[in-house]
Amino acid sequence: MTMSQEENPVKPWGGRFSEPTDAFVERFTASVTFDQRLYHHDINGSIAHATMLASVGVLSEDEKTAIIDGLEAIRSDIVEGKFDWSISLEDVHMNIEAELTKRIGITGKKLHTGRSRNDQVATDIRLYLRDEIDNIAKELTRLQSGILDLAEREADTIMPGFTHLQTAQPVTFGHHLMAWYEMMTRDYTRLMDCRERLNQSPLGAAALAGTTYPIDREQTAALLGFNHPTRNSLDSVSDRDFAIEFSAFAAILMTHLSRASEELVLWASAQFNFINLPDRFCTGSSIMPQKKNPDVPELVRGKTGRVNGHLISLLTLMKSQPLAYNKDNQEDKEPLFDAIDTVKDCLRAFADMVPAIESKKESMYEAAKRGFSTATDLADYLVRKGIPFRDSHEVVGKAVGYGVETGKDLSEMTLEELQGFSKEIQQDVFDVLTLEGSVAARNHIGGTAPAQVRIAVENAKQELEGRNS
């Protein structure tokens, strides 16, 4: 695609003005450099509008056919990179309309009857975002499917669970991965909620008050796949809630991916040594030959900041605008478009990478043995022996202190040593102090027991199948 700036082109709104637009102002106010990506949806909206105008007698059938054929020819040229975009024509809408008029003559000037760029762009963005939401939903589902496959493989793999990044209790790797899955399930439902709310047609709201032509908004809404028309013309052209809502979804999703990225970076480090990331998802150092850097999760973590920033940009953009449309709204597109592009790239990176993660089971297991991760199990054991929990907490705390001094884990102490803290402790205590016993005992809905992880994975697989049916 080429870009040009014509000398004093005829403006579609030029009748009111006595001098041409300043060349700098043309560049400053133009949006075609970034909104041209809306061309497909702009053409679809125009075809629906022309079809409706013909059905209510504003256009003849011949005029409708000429407009639609002309628009389809323009679409083909854009796809093939043969279309010349003009900054002087400001935006995607005026570029396409001007070219249509150039090709089919005066009939092209009738296309905009009963329509404003205000409802036109609102329609275009909704159509575009709806398609991108569907694309993102597919990629998010692919990532979740990969998480389930890995969680199923790692249902029995024991690792330390952390709070405050300190060893807390043993969990299974599969259970930890299913926590990622749950985060992203919430993301998916938020995305679908956003889609439902945006799927209303503003076309026909015109500039702000509607139009005097006998338009059929139900028809254009149906032709474009919307659930129904919007209910208030002022709100229709002013509303950008759908862009803000999508950006909020994107920010939360990216925050979840960032948290997962941080864990992958830590786990892949020599200090943790929990996982191996395949070489194809890592890079090296220009000076240190030994380095294998987890660049993909690091970059996902870094890109979260820009997506979060886009949400703030859109909120700030809208916060002081009176009704109805204002030129400020031109600034909604770049943050929205970049958020969409970034989310898609990050989801693709994760969806490709996660199924290829290799766990280092022995290293995970040894790490879980350190840090007295079964201390809570010992406290619960004493409760079952009739000791109040707060008292058992005190007893186990003293046993841990002894372990720190002697370098012994609770499971490594003798029965005599343990009974020095409570006579209620018997030989059966060693059944609950093993890592395997600890995770197996948490055998309830949402628990870390391998059996529960497998149930959770199976339920989640059925959930994903339901999305695709």
Curated annotation (Swiss-Prot):
It holds the Pfam family ASL_C2. It is an enzyme of class 4 (lyase). Keywords: Amino-acid biosynthesis, Arginine biosynthesis, Cytoplasm, Lyase. Gene3D superfamilies: Fumarase/aspartase (C-terminal domain), Fumarase/aspartase (Central domain), Fumarase/aspartase (N-terminal domain). It catalyses: 2-(N(omega)-L-arginino)succinate = fumarate + L-arginine. It comes from the Bacteria. One of its GO terms (biological process) is arginine biosynthetic process via ornithine. It is found in: Cytoplasm. GO terms for molecular function: argininosuccinate lyase activity. Its EC number is 4.3.2.1. InterPro entries: Arg_succ_lyase_C, Argininosuccinate_lyase, Fumarase/histidase_N, Fumarate_lyase_CS, Fumarate_lyase_fam, Fumarate_lyase_N, L-Aspartase-like. One of its GO terms (cellular component) is cytosol. The keyword Lyase applies. Belongs to the lyase 1 family. Argininosuccinate lyase subfamily. NCBIfam families: argH (TIGR00838). This is Argininosuccinate lyase. The lineage of its organism: Bacteria, Pseudomonadati, Pseudomonadota, Gammaproteobacteria, Cellvibrionales. The gene is argH.
